C-alpha cells in the first residue's frame, strides 16, 4: 500500500507517476508463469531469483519459454559463484577450490553449502543449491555446455583475484577491466552463445567479441561506480589505484566530506564514468543484432538502466556518501522504452548522454573526452536514424501542448 507521503510525492511529480502507471498496465506482456504445474525445484529457483535480484527477475520474465529457465539457472549458478567470492568470512584457502571447481559442482544434484557468513545476502541460495543443480540437469545439453564453460572461466578468474588479494585494492586499469571481464564480460559471451544457439540473435555477433565485451563492461563498470561507498565500507576497492591515486593520496580522501577532497573525488569519478561511457555505442551496436523481441527486452532493459545510472552518478557527490539509485518513475520509463525497439532505446541513450553533457563543465580535466564520448553516442544514432531528432522534437512539442492544455483545464475547473 502506498503511504500518504508517497501519494504526495507523485502528485507533485506527475512525470514520475505516468510511466509507473503505464508500466503496471503493460508489464503483464512478459512470460506468464504456470505455477500450478511447476515442480518444487522450479518454484524454488524462481524464489531465489527474486531474492537475489528483483530487477533481474523482472527482466527474466520478458524471455520466451525456450530461454527462460536456462537463463534463470545460468544466473543462479553465477550468483552462487559471486556469493562465494563476496563472502569476507571465508578464507582464501576455502574460496579458491570452491571457485575453481564450481563448474563441476553444478553437476552434483545433492551439493549444498552451509558455511557462508550468516549476514551474506544470498546465503540461502547456496544452502539450497541442490534445487538449482537438479534443474540444470534438465536443460538442453547444448545450453549445459555453454553454461559450464562460462562457469569455469568465471570461477578461475575470480579465484585468481582472490589469491592475489586484488579484491581489496585493484592496482591497474588493465586489472580493473580484467576483473570486469571475468564477472561480466564472460557472462555476455555466454548469453550471446545461448541466444545464437536458440536462433534469436545474429550469429555474426560471435565474430565481434568487442561488442559482447562492452555489454558486460558497461554494466559492471557502472555498478562499480555506483557502489563505491558501499564497497569502501566493506574494505573492497574496485576503482583502480592507477586512476584514484591521481586525485588522492589515500582512498579515504575520496569519501571524505571535506570540500577540498570532494572536488578531487568528483574529478576521479569523471574519469571512471568516462571509461564506462566509451563503451555505450558498442552496446547499441550489439542490440542491433538481436532478432527476437523478448530477448531484445532482456538485453535492452539493463543497458538502459546503466546509462541512466551513469548519468545519475556523474558529478554527483552523493555517491561518496551512500548508495544512490534512479527513481521508480525513471525506471519504469526506461523499461517501457526498452521493451519496444532499438529506436526507443537510442532515444533513451541520447536523452541521458545529453544530460551528462549538460552536467559536464570545463573545469573538469575530462571535459573534452566526456563530450566526445557523448557525441559518439549521438553519431551512432544519427547514422542509424537520421530523422530521429525531428521526430523527438515533434513529440516534445505535442507533450508540452497537452500539458499546457491540461493546466488550463484544471485552472478553468477551479475558477
UniProtKB/Swiss-Prot annotation:
Assigned protein family: Belongs to the phytoene/squalene synthase family.
Top enzyme class: transferase
Carbohydrate-modified residues: 114
The name this protein goes by in its record: Squalene synthase clz20
Necessary cofactors: Mg(2+)
PROSITE patterns with a match to the protein in the record: SQUALEN_PHYTOEN_SYN_1, SQUALEN_PHYTOEN_SYN_2
Keyword NADP: yes
Biological-process GO terms, alphabetical: ergosterol biosynthetic process; farnesyl diphosphate metabolic process; isoprenoid biosynthetic process
One Pfam family from the record: SQS_PSY
UniProt keyword terms in alphabetical order: Glycoprotein, Isoprene biosynthesis, Lipid biosynthesis, Lipid metabolism, Magnesium, Membrane, Multifunctional enzyme, NADP, Steroid biosynthesis, Steroid metabolism, Sterol biosynthesis, Sterol metabolism, Transferase, Transmembrane, Transmembrane helix
Pathway: Terpene metabolism; lanosterol biosynthesis; lanosterol from farnesyl diphosphate: step 1/3
A GO molecular-function annotation: squalene synthase [NAD(P)H] activity
Enzyme Commission numbers on file: 2.5.1.21
Lineage: superkingdom: Eukaryota
One Gene Ontology cellular component annotation held by this UniProt entry: endoplasmic reticulum membrane
Localisation: Membrane
NCBIfam families: squal_synth
Regions crossing the membrane: 395-415
Membrane topology term: Single-pass membrane protein
Chain's role: Squalene synthase; part of the gene cluster that mediates the biosynthesis of squalestatin S1 (SQS1, also known as zaragozic acid A), a heavily oxidized fungal polyketide that offers potent cholesterol lowering activity by targeting squalene synthase (SS). Catalyzes the condensation of 2 two farnesyl pyrophosphate moieties to form squalene. The presence of a gene encoding a squalene synthase supports the identification of the cluster as being responsible for SQS1 production and suggests a likely mechanism for self-resistance.
Reaction(s) catalysed by this chain's protein: 2 (2E,6E)-farnesyl diphosphate + NADH + H(+) = squalene + 2 diphosphate + NAD(+); 2 (2E,6E)-farnesyl diphosphate + NADPH + H(+) = squalene + 2 diphosphate + NADP(+)
Amino acid at each position: 500500500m502506498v503511504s500518504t507521503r508517497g501519494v504526495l510525492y507523485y502528485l507533485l511529480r506527475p512525470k514520475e507517476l505516468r510511466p509507473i502507471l503505464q508500466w503496471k498496465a503493460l508489464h503483464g506482456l512478459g512470460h506468464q508463469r504456470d505455477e500450478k504445474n511447476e515442480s518444487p525445484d522450479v518454484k524454488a529457483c524462481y524464489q531465489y531469483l527474486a531474492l537475489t535480484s528483483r530487477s533481474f527477475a523482472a527482466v527474466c520474465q520478458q524471455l520466451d519459454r525456450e530461454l527462460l529457465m536456462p537463463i534463470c539457472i545460468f544466473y543462479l549458478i553465477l550468483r552462487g559463484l559471486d556469493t562465494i567470492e563476496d563472502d569476507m568470512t571465508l578464507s582464501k584457502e576455502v574460496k579458491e577450490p570452491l571457485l575453481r571447481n564450481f563448474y563441476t559442482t553444478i553437476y552434483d544434484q545433492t551439493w549444498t553449502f552451509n558455511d557462508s557468513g550468516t549476514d551474506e545476502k544470498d546465503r540461502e541460495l547456496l544452502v539450497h543449491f541442490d534445487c538449482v543443480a537438479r534443474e540444470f540437469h534438465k536443460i538442453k545439453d547444448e545450453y549445459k555446455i555453454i553454461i559450464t564453460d562460462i562457469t569455469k572461466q568465471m570461477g578461475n578468474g575470480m579465484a585468481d583475484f582472490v589469491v592475489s588479494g586484488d579484491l581489496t585494492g585493484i592496482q591497474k586499469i588493465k586489472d580493473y577491466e580484467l576483473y570486469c571481464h571475468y564477472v561480466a564480460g564472460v557472462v555476455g559471451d555466454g548469453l550471446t552463445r545461448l541466444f545464437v544457439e536458440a536462433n534469436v540473435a545474429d550469429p555474426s555477433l560471435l565474430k565481434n567479441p568487442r561488442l559482447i565485451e562492452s555489454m558486460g563492461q558497461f554494466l559492471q563498470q557502472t555498478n562499480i561506480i555506483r557502489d563505491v561507498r558501499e564497497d569502501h565500507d566493506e574494505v573492497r576497492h574496485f576503482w583502480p589505484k592507477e586512476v584514484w591515486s591521481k586525485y588522492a593520496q589515500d582512498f579515504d580522501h575520496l569519501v571524505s566530506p571535506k570540500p577540498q577532497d570532494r572536488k578531487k573525488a568528483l574529478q576521479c569519478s569523471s574519469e571512471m564514468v568516462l571509461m564506462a561511457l566509451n563503451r555505450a555505442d558498442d552496446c547499441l551496436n550489439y542490440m542491433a543484432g538481436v532478432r527476437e523481441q523478448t530477448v531484445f527486452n532482456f538485453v535492452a532493459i539493463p543497458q538502459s538502466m546503466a546509462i541512466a545510472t551513469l548519468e545519475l552518478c556523474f558529478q554527483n557527490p552523493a555517491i561518496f556518501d551512500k548508495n544512490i539509485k534512479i527513481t521508480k518513475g525513471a525506471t519504469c520509463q526506461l523499461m517501457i522504452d526498452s521493451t519496444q525497439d532499438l529506436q526507443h532505446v537510442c532515444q533513451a541513450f541520447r536523452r541521458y548522454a545529453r544530460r551528462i553533457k549538460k552536467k559536464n563543465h570545463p573545469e573538469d580535466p575530462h571535459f573534452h573526452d566526456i563530450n566526445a564520448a557523448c557525441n559518439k553516442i549521438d553519431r551512432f544514432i544519427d547514422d542509424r536514424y537520421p530523422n530521429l531528432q525531428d521526430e523527438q522534437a515533434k513529440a516534445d512539442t505535442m507533450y508540452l501542448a497537452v500539458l499546457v492544455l491540461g493546466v488550463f483545464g484544471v485552472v478553468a475547473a477551479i475558477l
